Swiss-Prot record:
One of its GO terms (cellular component) is plasma membrane. GO terms for molecular function: GTP binding; GTPase activity; guanosine tetraphosphate binding; ribosome binding; translation elongation factor activity. Residues 2-184 form the tr-type G domain. The gene is lepA. It is a peripheral membrane protein. Gene3D superfamilies: 3.30.70.240, Elongation factor 4, C-terminal domain, Elongation Factor G (Translational Gtpase), domain 3, P-loop containing nucleotide triphosphate hydrolases, Translation factors. The lineage of its organism: Bacteria, Pseudomonadati, Pseudomonadota, Gammaproteobacteria, Vibrionales. PROSITE patterns: G_TR_1, G_TR_2. Keywords: Cell inner membrane, Cell membrane, GTP-binding, Hydrolase, Membrane, Nucleotide-binding, Protein biosynthesis. GO terms for biological process: positive regulation of translation. It catalyses: GTP + H2O = GDP + phosphate + H(+). The keyword Cell inner membrane applies. This is Elongation factor 4. Its EC number is 3.6.5.n1. The keyword Ribosomal protein does not apply.
Length: 597
């Protein structure tokens, strides 16, 4: 056991976590040069296309150190985006240490801080690594000072490396062996193993990634899931090198995968404890705290025949992504679907794309909303995650809007732009601290403004240098109203939005204008209106397509032309009474484009 080292690699987006993982695998001979590819751990097509890590991946490597001993390194490559911070905290729960990778050119950024604090809260040993020292813009001395100043950990002798060229990777490995403590646990005690992650395999059933805390897991042994009480037989178990390799047992302190032939999606929940069926442990390990979704949106299959497949797909995906929340929902415009909760907009995009790719579904997404706390005159407090669930205006005492605490790190030359943006988003300044050239800003901004397009706007106003980390702070009373959209006089529930009263007229106007761009012209006029209660605040008309009925009249009397035009008008009127308007997917997401030029 004293030769085992469990650690995670944490960093801000694009600071080189996955590339460093590749180098560690190569140096330790986990894969031959022929099998090696860039970002070998980003196994999903989506991850490779976007160049980001979405799922944490674990690898077991053997490393012979300079002291002649062979160490078993179990490490987990984690995502960097704020939307996937839950993946990071789960990965850290399985480790004794973390490599904090910092780009020697960019320096400390917001996610560096957030992930590092998560690791410190869990009492992990944090080892700073300065990456990308081969870049012309690299300034390791300045960045080491920044780490000490902003993060508050000792970084004078931080290991310097370049994951791209492989320079200094040996030093990183030596540092891991020296600085990260071996796991603690009782090899002779009753079995306790924590499920860090699960996913569904069509042939094997549920595959679970586990960390053995006490005791050992053996092939063909009978085990019990502590949350469900079900007993299973271990069919196969093993480690990732990153190939899936079978072994006969997993001992205390090791990380590996287990297959028990479980077909029920709820059979092996993430955060559950595995113990032996006979003489097992009585107490489960502390699991993970449940995360609350911040953004809700309706997902509906375009074809109603796909509803069953869609439900199964969501079940399998939620097994793999424990932060996804979903419940059935029906809409008059879109039929049956699900109301899904996500951690942020990127998370929502990724889930939708995974559902469409991995399960061949065609989906329509409604505009995302956050959760409002509504105090009603009759039913006490209700939480509203969809505009259609908002009670009638005369039943509402007060609407509480969720406020996010945003920590922004920005170089001082872009400070003015960022403050202007925060004020535009109804933000309140809480704190401002200068660290050399960097400024740490803390703002309280309404969550609805943050999740919509704040991150994109922040990046563009600071040329990509500002970085953001946010979390839910509290609910605050606010003057919110629901803006309904009517098409030819009919309310479309899936298009309603909740917005601040001061912004309602502008938002309504913009929304109607955007919808006009996206709805194709029909044979009759389409009136698009935005309304608050019974008051219409904006209108746009998509003009009808019409045939030139008087083209065949050359000379002759004007009354002949009038007669033909009147006849066409009567036909159009009749058509409008029975005609349906088909809305494309873009029309449902027009709200996302509101305010963008």
């Amino acid at each position: 056991m004293k030769h085992i080292r469990n650690f995670s690699i944490i960093a801000h987006i694009d600071h080189g976590k996955s590339t460093l993982s590749d180098r560690l695998i190569q140096v330790c001979g986990g894969l031959s040069n022929r099998e090696m590819s860039a970002q070998v751990l980003d196994s999903m097509d989506l991850e490779r296309e976007r160049g980001i890590t979405i799922k944490a991946q674990s690898v077991t490597l053997d490393y012979t150190a300079k002291d002649g001993e062979t160490y078993q390194l179990n490490f987990i490559d984690t995502p960097g985006h704020v939307d996937f911070s839950y993946e990071v905290s789960r990965s850290l729960a399985a480790c004794e240490g973390a490599l904090l990778v910092v780009d020697a050119g960019q320096g400390v950024e917001a996610q560096t801080l957030a992930n590092c604090y998560t690791a410190m809260e869990m009492d992990l040993e944090v080892v700073p690594i300065l990456n990308k020292i081969d870049l012309p813009a690299a300034d390791p001395e300045r960045v080491a000072e920044e780490i000490e100043d902003i993060v508050g950990i000792d970084a004078i002798d931080a290991t310097r490396c370049s994951a791209k060229t492989g320079l200094g990777v040996e030093d990183v490995l030596e540092n891991i062996v020296a600085a990260i403590p071996p796991p603690e646990g009782d090899p002779e005690g009753p079995l306790q193993a924590l499920i860090i992650d699960s996913w569904f395999d069509n042939y094997l059933g549920i595959v679970s990634l586990v960390r053995v805390k006490n005791g050992s897991l053996k092939k063909n042994a009978k085990i019990k899931m502590m949350s469900t009480g079900q007993v299973w037989n271990i069919d196969r178990l093993g480690i990732f090198t990153p190939k899936q390799i079978d072994t006969t047992e997993l001992n205390t302190g090791e990380v590996g995968w287990v297959v028990c032939g479980i077909k029920d999606i709820l059979g092996a929940p993430v955060g559950d404890t595995i113990t032996t069926a006979k003489d097992g442990s009585e107490t489960p390990l502390p699991g993970f705290k449940k995360v609350k979704p911040q953004v809700y949106a309706g997902l509906f299959p375009i074809s109603s025949d796909d509803y069953e497949n869609f439900r199964d797909a969501l079940g399998k995906l939620s097994l793999n992504d424990a932060s996804l929340f979903y419940e059935p929902e029906s809409s008059t415009a879109l039929g049956f679907g699900f109301r899904c909760g996500f951690l942020g907009m990127l998370h929502m995009e990724i889930i939708q794309e995974r559902l469409e790719r991995e399960y061949n579904l065609e989906l329509i997404t409604t505009a995302p909303t956050v959760v409002y706390e509504v105090e009603t005159t009759r039913n006490g407090t209700v939480y509203v995650d969809s505009p259609s669930k908002l009670p009638a205006v005369n039943d509402i005492e007060v609407i509480g809007e969720p406020i996010a605490r945003c920590n922004i790190l920005v170089p001082s030359e872009y400070l003015g732009n960022v403050i202007t943006l925060c004020i535009e988003k109804r933000g309140m300044q809480v704190d401002m601290i200068y660290h050399g050239n960097q400024v740490a800003l803390t703002y309280d901004i309404p969550m609805s403004e943050v999740v919509l397009d704040f991150f994109d706007r922040l990046k563009s106003t600071s040329r990509g240098y500002a970085s953001l980390d946010y979390n839910f702070q509290r609910y605050e009373p606010s003057n919110m109203v629901r803006v309904d959209v009517m098409i030819n006089g009919e309310r479309v529930d899936a298009l309603a939005i909740i917005t601040h009263k001061d912004h309602a007229n502008g938002r309504g106007r913009d929304l109607v204008d955007k919808m006009k761009e996206f709805i194709p012209r029909q044979m009759f006029d389409i009136a698009i209106q935005a309304a608050i209660g019974g008051m219409i605040i904006a209108r746009a008309t998509v003009k009808q397509l019409r045939k030139n009925v008087i083209a065949k009249c050359y000379g002759g009397d004007i009354s002949r032309k009038k007669k033909l035009l009147q006849k066409q008008k009567a036909g159009k009127k009749r058509m409008k009474q029975i005609g349906n308007v088909e809305l494309p997917q873009e029309a449902f997401l027009a709200i996302l484009h509101v305010g963008k030029k």
